[in-house]
Curated annotation (Swiss-Prot):
Protein name (record): Dihydrolipoyllysine-residue acetyltransferase component of pyruvate dehydrogenase complex
GO CC term, one of those recorded: cytoplasm
Pfam family of the protein (one): 2-oxoacid_dh
Sequence intervals crossing the membrane: none
Function of the molecule: The pyruvate dehydrogenase complex catalyzes the overall conversion of pyruvate to acetyl-CoA and CO(2). It contains multiple copies of three enzymatic components: pyruvate dehydrogenase (E1), dihydrolipoamide acetyltransferase (E2) and lipoamide dehydrogenase (E3).
An example molecular function term from Gene Ontology annotations: lipoic acid binding
UniProt family annotation: Belongs to the 2-oxoacid dehydrogenase family.
Enzyme Commission number(s) from the entry: 2.3.1.12
Reactions it catalyzes: N(6)-[(R)-dihydrolipoyl]-L-lysyl-[protein] + acetyl-CoA = N(6)-[(R)-S(8)-acetyldihydrolipoyl]-L-lysyl-[protein] + CoA
Catalytic residue list: H383
Length: 410
């Protein structure tokens, strides 16, 4: 047995049962001494015939743990020549002592501090505890350490697979009479690669909801009708951008990104609220960014949106329009149509909000049906960092801002 600083150790977990097939080096039991816990492996492959020890029992070097069947005669003969007994037990045996605690325990066994619950979780994920750096007291491995290690492993596996993955397109022998060829633009090719990366690396979930924008629309129509410069008209999107900036201040996790930091998965929050807006151009979709949206009023946001949209469509985007990575993206299809859709998150962001066409719907106010203008909202989010409860709270907050635009003035 490896030196764990004591002659006697306590059995705290039995990892097998009678009839189990075990291989050499599979863990049989977990024992705990004064300094650490350790899993004791089988010295041979076979079937568990009998388990000798029980939880809470004190054992020492040479104690018989279990009896295995299905071992070749040479192994049996070798083991039968030595009789092992464990302390504080009335049982003795000269059977194949293949599960004995002995000084020749596999060199790969390393002392680790971990509870049985953590060890079971590590076995479930097929993770070796000796590969994990514990963050608990005196280096104890916690449940969070195992989960973090698993997430990092998945993260690295995905990164490796992405390096080997190309955008696959259909290949076949066709004639020009059968098909018409339309080549993708450089923007569309670049976009397709980014979309593939997002779809493969981010577990998407989409939360659908509707916001009552009846009062907002009444105000917007009145404001626009009084404008002398009609190029400065306000759109519904302007108010949504402002509402989202408020929500990002209230729920900063949506304004971050996932990173692998010091071998741990972490959410890094962006210092500024920079919202990307999907713009449809002849070359494909572009996502210029409005920086520091939370510091701007409705008129400033409207002016910035008009400028970057015109630059995107005329292929005159400045480096300043895209140099700061967006922290959140909004995709607006309301001017085209549709009721709901599932927008794909822009990697490495954590969420994206989709807007569809507003429709008048009947609303029951306890006395009668009244018409309400309802704006469909589709919030896609990264389920690794954001759970469903947080997503509902976020979209509910956005709805509140849009239903009563006085909140946007605060």
């Amino acid at each position: 047995m490896p030196d764990i600083g004591t002659d006697l150790v306590e059995v705290i977990e039995i990892l097998v049962k009678i009839g189990d097939q075990v291989k050499k080096d599979d863990s049989l039991i977990t024992v705990e001494g004064q300094k650490a816990s350790i899993e004791i492996p089988a010295s041979h492959t076979g079937t568990i015939k009998n388990i000798i020890v029980h939880i809470g029992e004190k054992i020492t070097t040479g104690s018989l743990i279990a009896i295995l069947n299905g071992i070749d005669d040479n192994v049996k003969s070798k083991n039968d020549s030595s009789s092992y007994s464990f302390k504080n037990s009335k049982n003795t045996s000269t059977n194949s002592n293949l599960g004995n605690v002995n000084n020749n325990i596999n060199n790969r066994t390393i002392l680790v501090h971990a509870t049985p619950t953590v060890r079971r979780l590590a076995r479930k994920f097929d993770i070796k505890l000796e590969n994990i750096t514990g963050t608990g007291r005196k280096g104890r491995i916690l449940k969070e350490d195992v989960i973090s290690y698993k997430n990092i492993s998945l993260f690295n596996d995905i990164k490796k697979s992405l390096k080997k993955t190309n955008v696959n397109y259909y290949k076949d022998n066709v004639t020009c009479d059968d098909f018409k060829s339309i080549e993708l633009t450089r923007t569309q090719i670049r976009s397709s690669k980014n979309l593939l990366k997002s779809w493969l690396t981010i577990p998407h979930v989409t939360q659908f909801d509707e916001s009552d924008i009846t009062e907002l629309e009444n105000f917007r129509q009145k404001y626009n009708s009084d404008l002398k410069d009609k190029s400065k008209k306000l759109t519904i999107l302007i108010f949504v951008i402002k509402a989202v900036s408020k929500a990002l201040e209230m729920f900063p996790k949506f304004n971050g990104r996932l990173i692998n930091k010091d071998n741990r998965i972490a959410i890094v929050l962006n210092e500024h609220i920079n919202i990307g807006i999907v713009v449809d151009t002849d070359d494909g979709l572009l996502v210029p960014v409005i920086n520091r949206v939370n510091k701007k009023n409705i008129s400033s946001i409207s002016n910035d949106l008009r400028i970057i949209s015109e630059r995107a469509r005329s292929r005159k985007l400045n480096f300043s329009d895209i140099k700061e990575y967006g922290s959140f993206t909004i995709s607006n299809l309301g001017g085209i149509g549709g009721t709901n859709f599932t927008p794909i998150i822009k990697y490495p962001e954590l969420a994206i909000l989709g807007i569809s066409r507003a429709l008048i719907k009947p609303y029951w106010n306890s006395h009668a049906f009244i018409p309400k203008l309802m704006l469909p909202l589709s919030l896609s989010y990264d389920h690794r960092a954001i759970d469903g409860v947080a997503a509902v709270r976020f979209i509910t907050f956005v709805k509140k801002m849009l239903t009563d635009i006085r909140f946007l003035m605060i």
